[in-house]
Regions:
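Glycine/small-residue-rich loop that forms an oxyanion/phosphate-binding "nest" at active or ligand-binding sites
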Residues: 82, 93, 101-102
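Hydrophobic alpha-helical transmembrane segments
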Residues: 1-77, 91, 95-96, 106, ...
Length: 254
């Protein structure tokens, strides 16, 4: 029952998928991050359904790309994009660490957030349009699962930049050892299946995900002294985009 409640809390927190409502407690949040990747699985399945509709019902290319880019936003309600934009404002302020952390708390949107989100959207849509091979698209769909596995691992492994906020609360209440092990197991199983589906596409995506994870650790440590809830959303976005670019590039080559 506790695991079911943790799953519901995870989907309630990180998606717009309707879930039963109840009062959360610390026990419910202990294993919440274990189920975080499955929101990515839902996104991947919806994208595959959309690809099937595109292939069989005469959907135009531009409609296919636009709706395909919109599906992750619709499922999550833009939760991670909000973190991406706040983080872009903070990183591009070039101010001292304390002021960057203050910018992350600011509810106002800055010019750099808009500019970088526009650039991100164009890059993601361009890469998405290049992923035409069926096996490449299966790997791409699984990337949303992988990005969330890595994001959850970062939450329970990396240093927090501050001692308050949602990320600190979730990391503090999580059973770190069990959550970390569960996420690593899910990540390893997913990658193993993808390597069977298509070795070149899987290797390209795994490299992109690993580089994104490394960059995230180095960048947040340098700029903020650790991670926050906003940077967790930022990581999900950059990891998804990096994997899409890698798959789009390999699709173009082979």
């Amino acid at each position: 029952m506790k695991l079911i409640r943790s799953c519901i809390v995870s989907f309630s927190m990180y998606s717009k998928i309707p879930m039963p409502q109840f009062k959360w407690n610390d026990d419910d949040m202990k294993y919440m991050l274990v189920f975080f990747p499955w929101i990515g699985a839902v996104i991947g399945l919806l994208l595959m359904l959309w690809r099937y509709i595109y292939s069989h019902f005469g959907v135009t290319d531009i409609c296919y790309v636009c709706i395909g880019a919109l599906i992750p936003i619709a499922v999550t309600g833009g939760f991670h994009i909000d973190g991406f934009m706040d983080t872009m404002d903070a990183f591009h302020s070039y101010k001292p660490r304390e002021e960057k952390l203050a910018i992350l708390k600011d509810s106002h949107i800055g010019a750099f957030a808009v500019i970088m989100f526009a650039a991100y959207g164009l890059l993601f849509m361009g890469a998405f349009s290049q992923i035409m091979d069926d096996k490449a698209f299966i790997v791409f769909g699984a990337g949303f699962f992988i990005a969330r596995c890595l994001s959850g691992i970062a939450v329970v492994s990396f240093k927090s930049a501050k001692s308050d906020g949602l990320l600190f609360m979730f990391a503090d209440t999580a059973h770190r050892t069990i959550v970390r092990a569960a996420l690593y197991i899910q990540l390893a199983l997913c990658m193993a299946v993808l390597l069977i589906v298509s070795l070149p596409y899987a290797v390209a995506m795994i490299i992109a995900a690993a580089l994104s994870f490394w960059y995230y650790y180095v960048k947040t440590k340098k700029e903020l002294g650790g991670i926050t809830g906003d940077t967790a959303g930022y990581f999900v976005c950059i990891c998804e985009c990096a994997m899409a670019v890698a798959l789009g590039g390999v699709s173009f080559i082979i």
